[in-house]
Amino acid sequence: MTDLSIAVTRLPHGADLPLPAYATEHAAGMDLLAAVAEPVILAPGERRLIPTGLAIALPDGYEAQVRPRSGLALKHGITLLNSPGTIDADYRGEVGVILANLGADPFTVERGMRIAQMVIARYARAAWDVVDSLPASARGSGGFGSTGTRG
């Protein structure tokens, strides 16, 4: 593994919260915390933008992917819309997390709660090569379940 230095600014409403951190030695994602002033109650079916109190500057060639936490999804039906959310290297605003409650019960987001995870990833920029036909493949144009449902 290579450590990558990422510039981060703590915004005033998140200054007292810990920085995102990896929960275990081999974790790919860092946990993002809710920088809410007061608890936020998400009713079933509701979505809200939750602040993190952080702004970042990623190196060229990197993005940050904001992803749901599996425990919140399984136990409470809490997920992220626009998942994974992409934070581009040239974005300098606050990192926000769009939480959605797909569960049957209201869910309370409290200050400092781990609400999402952030994965830092390299990316490639593509250039289109317009051709008259595409090369053949075993799959062809089959999609949307065309490979079956059984292993």
Swiss-Prot record:
**What Enzyme Commission number(s) does the record list for this chain?**
3.6.1.23
Q: Which UniProt keywords apply?
A: Hydrolase, Magnesium, Metal-binding, Nucleotide metabolism
Q: Which residues bind substrate?
A: R69, S70, G71, N82, T86, I87, D88
Q: Which family does it belong to?
A: Belongs to the dUTPase family.
Q: Which GO terms describe its molecular function?
A: dUTP diphosphatase activity; magnesium ion binding
CDD domains tied to this protein: trimeric_dUTPase
Q: What is this protein called?
A: Deoxyuridine 5'-triphosphate nucleotidohydrolase
Q: Which SUPFAM superfamilies match?
A: dUTPase-like
Pathway assignment reads:
Pyrimidine metabolism; dUMP biosynthesis; dUMP from dCTP (dUTP route): step 2/2
Obligatory cofactor(s) = Mg(2+)
Q: Which GO terms describe its biological process?
A: dUMP biosynthetic process; dUTP catabolic process
This chain is encoded by the gene named dut
As its record notes, the protein acts as a catalyst of:
dUTP + H2O = dUMP + diphosphate + H(+)
Q: Which domain of life is it from?
A: Bacteria
